[in-house]
């Protein structure tokens, strides 16, 4: 099981500036961190136009991602990388690689990085809450990025256990900052199909691809294990502050798909008030996570009852709740 690992940050600079001298692409490679997430800002958040941060890729138990920004060719930019799990903050300034004046850059116009490999396809699972509540609709999503303006037409075919299905919705393509398109197809699925481990396949056709790309996803294989849920009061050391933390510890569950939310005196709490860690693999292959609810100390002192609700497929009726409040005295 992977330990918390801080990322390394490397600048990515084009080796030549386009001779019109207008725009160029700079980037930062954030490599070898665990767990998710990291945040990447440019110029401390002042630079938002022309930014494209790609999804993280998991390799050998560690995540990596790339963030790119398009700026005027005379400009440098600083990427600000934060990895909360390891309390790491790294600022890396990226500037174009200058060639000596007597020998100006004579390489052909730098191809934009998105065109090197053509379109890429990613498939995403349904949200755990959607698969566990009959009143909600679980959806598998297929996303195609780096679709060129020359070949913008994208077709999707969906399969459930290799049988074609026709109820997907393809959304209108969206133009990205770098003049490529992003296209998304969403397949509503049956709760039981996901929970029983059926395979969902998205097949993508585009003339810029030498052959269709297929991506498959299914629930993690293995025997489900029921989570144990414990609520923890604020630490005595924290009670001198105006805000205190009520914690929900959820352990011993498998697979990692889980949903946690809170209520205060039976009223649902806004998601802004609590933070969940990602599920973390434990030594025995099960998962655990913490959920931290921040509350006013005055509300805690008044005996407000806080309830941690956990949804997981191994639970009876897919849900369990644990309540906590200040003990009298």
Curated annotation (Swiss-Prot):
**Per its UniProt record, what Pfam families does this chain match?**
C1-set (PF07654)
| Cystine pairings recorded for this chain | 28-79, 142-202, 248-308
Q: Which domain of life is it from?
A: Eukaryota
One GO CC term, this protein: extracellular region
Question: Which InterPro entries does the entry link to?
Answer: Ig-like_dom, Ig-like_dom_sf, Ig-like_fold, Ig/MHC_CS, Ig_C1-set, Immune_Resp_Modulators
PROSITE patterns xrefs = IG_LIKE (PS50835), IG_MHC (PS00290)
- Record's protein name: Ig gamma-2 chain C region
Task: Tell me what organism the protein belongs to.
Answer: Cavia porcellus
């Amino acid at each position: 099981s992977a330990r918390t690992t801080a990322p390394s940050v490397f600048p990515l600079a084009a080796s030549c500036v386009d001779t019109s001298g207008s725009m160029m692409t700079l980037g930062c490679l954030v490599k070898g961190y665990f767990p998710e997430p990291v945040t990447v800002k440019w110029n401390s958040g002042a630079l938002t136009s022309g930014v494209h941060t790609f999804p993280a890729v998991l390799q050998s138990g560690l995540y990596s991602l790339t963030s790119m920004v398009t700026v005027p060719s005379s400009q440098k930019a600083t990427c600000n990388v934060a990895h909360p799990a390891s309390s790491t903050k790294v600022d890396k300034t990226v500037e174009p690689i200058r060639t000596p004046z007597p020998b100006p850059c004579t390489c052909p116009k730098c191809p934009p990085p998105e065109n090197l490999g053509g379109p890429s396809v990613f498939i995403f699972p349904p949200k755990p809450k959607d698969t566990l509540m009959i009143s909600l609709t679980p959806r598998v999503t297929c996303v195609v990025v780096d679709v060129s303006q020359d070949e913008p037409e994208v077709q999707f075919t969906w399969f459930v256990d290799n049988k074609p299905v026709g109820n997907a919705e393809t959304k209108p393509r969206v133009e990205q900052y770098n003049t490529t398109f992003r296209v998304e197809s969403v397949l509503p699925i049956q709760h039981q199909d996901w929970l029983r481990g059926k395979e969902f396949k998205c097949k993508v056709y585009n003339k810029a691809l030498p052959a269709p790309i297929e991506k498959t996803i299914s629930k993690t294989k293995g025997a489900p294990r029921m989570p144990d849920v414990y609520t923890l009061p604020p630490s005595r050391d924290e009670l001198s502050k105006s805000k205190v933390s009520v914690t929900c510890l959820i352990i011993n569950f498998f697979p990692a798909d889980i949903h946690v939310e809170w209520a205060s005196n039976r009223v649902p709490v806004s998601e802004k008030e609590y933070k969940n860690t990602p599920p973390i693999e434990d030594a025995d292959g099960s998962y655990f996570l913490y959920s931290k609810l921040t509350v006013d100390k005055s509300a805690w002192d008044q005996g407000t009852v806080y309830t941690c609700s956990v949804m997981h497929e191994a639970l009876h009726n897919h849900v369990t709740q644990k309540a906590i409040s200040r003990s009298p005295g």
